[in-house]
Amino acid sequence: MKKYMGIIVDAISRRQFKGEITVENGKIIRVEEKEHDNEQYILPGLVDAHVHIESSMTVPSVFARMAVAKGTVAVVSDPHEIANVMGEEGIEFMLEDSKKSPLKVYFGVPSCVPATPFESSGAVLDINAVDRLLAKDDLHYLSEMMNFPGVILEFPDVMAKLESARKHGKVIDGHAPGLRGADLQKYIGAGISTDHECFEYEEAREKIELGMKILIREGSSARNFETLYPLIDEYPDHVMLCTDDSHPDTLIYEGHIDKLIRRGQEKGLDIYNLIRTAVFNPVEHYGLNVGLLREGDPADFIIVDNLKSFNILSTFIDGECVYENGKVLFPLEKVPAKNVFNRNKISIDDVKLVPPAGAIQEQTTEKGIKKIRVIVANDGELVTGQELIVPKIENGNLVSDPERDILKMVVLSRYSDDPVRIGFIKNIGLEKGAIASSIAHDSHNIIAVGATDEDIVETVNRLIKNKGGIAVGTAENLLDLPLEVAGLMSTLEGEEVASRYHLLNEEARKLGTSLESPFMTLAFMSLLVIPELKLGDKGLFDVTKFEFVDLFADE
C-alpha cells in the first residue's frame, strides 16, 4: 500500500483540494481530503486519442518511454502504417512489442490497407482479414475510414468492413477532411463516430452538431489546435486531443498531450474542460481501462509542479511509477529488425522526363510549352493545392527550377522495380540538394524531392541501400537515418532517433527549406485520400476527381 499527497484535481466535480490517494494492487482504493504542505498537483494520466506510433520513427516500446515522460499513460493507436508494409504480421509485431512497456496501447484494425486501389502496397487487408482481426480482444476499434467516397457511394467492401465493426461491437473512427452537408450526414449515418481531420472551425462545429466527436490534432506537420481550440470550452463533451503523426523531436522537445494542456491554459481555456478532453472523453468513448482518479480505478495518474507550467514530475500506470525526476523507470528491451523492401537502385535516366509529343506547341503558352500540374504544399497542413505552371526544360528534360521554388518530385515502389513516377511541387523551398524518405503515406513507397536530378538519385539510392529510412543532402554529401523496422521505425532509443532526426531537419533547412517539418510534409505528398493533388507510385492523382491526371494540362 502506498500513499501520495498533493493538490488533487477532480475534473468530475470541477474542484481542487488538498488530499491523499491510497494505492494498492494497482488500484486507487481511497481518495480523501487531508491537510498537508505538499504543493504539487495530482491529476489523471493523459491519453492521446489517435496516434500512429510508427510516425515517431520508434517502435512501441521505445515510443512508450517518450510518452510517459510527458505524462501520457495511454494511447489509442492505428497500426495502419506498418500494416500497409507488412500486413497482419506488422500488426502482430506492434501488439507484441507494446507489451514490453507499461504504457497502455489500444490498437485498432486498419480499415484501408491499401488506402486506395491506385497505389502499390506491401499488403491487402480485405474484409476477411478485417473481420478476423476485429474478433480479437486486443484490437479495440475499426481505425479511420479514409475512403469516405466509398462510404458515401456505398462500395460493398467498405460497407462490409463497417458492418463487421458493428457486429463485433467495435467503435468506428473517421477520416473526412472537408466533408460537409448531405455527404457528411451519410458518412455519419454509416456509424462513423469521430474525425481528426478538421482544419476549419465551422466544419468541426457542423460535425459536432451532427453527433460526431472531434479530435483536435496537433502533430509535427498537421497542426489544427490554433484553429479549433475554442471547441474545447464550447463542446467539452465532444472533443478529444490527439497528435496523429508526431516525430521524435516533437515529442521530446515540444511535448505530447501535455503541451496542449499548457497551450489551452494560455488561451484562457477552462482547466477542467482541458482535462476532460485529454483524459475522460477518450476513456469513455473507446471504453479504455484507464483510471480517472476515482476510488476503484486503475492507479493511472501524474504529478505536476503546478497547473500552469504543467511540468511532469512523475507518471504512474497501474500503481507503478514509470517516470520520475527525469528518468524512465522501465528497461529498454532489444527489438529485432523486420522489413519488406525489394527495390534495386535507380539511375539518372530513371528520373528524366522528356515532354511527350505535342507538349511543346507554340500556341499553348508564351514559351511554347504546355503548362504542367504542380502540387502546392501548405506548411502545417496535409491538404495541397494545385497550379498550372510553365515548366523549366534543359536539354529536352523537365527539371527543377529552384529560383521559382518548383521542384521535381519522384515516387517509386519499394516493393518492385516498377517505373519511377515524376511530378512537380511548389513551396518545399530547397535551393540545392534533395530530401528522400521511405515514410510516404500510406503505402510507404519511396518519395524524394530535389533541386537537381543527380541529388534526387543519390538520396533515393541511399534509402535503397539502407532498405528504408530518410536522407538529405547533395550528391556529394548525404546524411541519413536508417529505419530498420519496415522502413518506418528505428530500434534505437528515442533520444538518439530525435537527435539524428533533428540534424537531418537542420540540414534540410541549410539547403533552403523553411518548412516546419520538411520530412513530415514530404511524407503526405503521396497520400491519395487527402485533397487536392498528390503523386503516387502509379502517377499523378487528383483526389477531388478521384482519378489519375496527366502532368501536362489541357487548358
Swiss-Prot record:
Keyword Manganese: yes
Enzymatic class: hydrolase
Keyword tags: Hydrolase, Manganese
Superkingdom of source: Archaea
EC code: 3.5.4.2
Similarity-based family: Belongs to the metallo-dependent hydrolases superfamily. Adenine deaminase family.
UniProt cross-references to HAMAP family, sorted A to Z: Adenine_deamin
Protein name, per record: Adenine deaminase
Species name: Methanosarcina mazei (strain ATCC BAA-159 / DSM 3647 / Goe1 / Go1 / JCM 11833 / OCM 88) (Methanosarcina frisia)
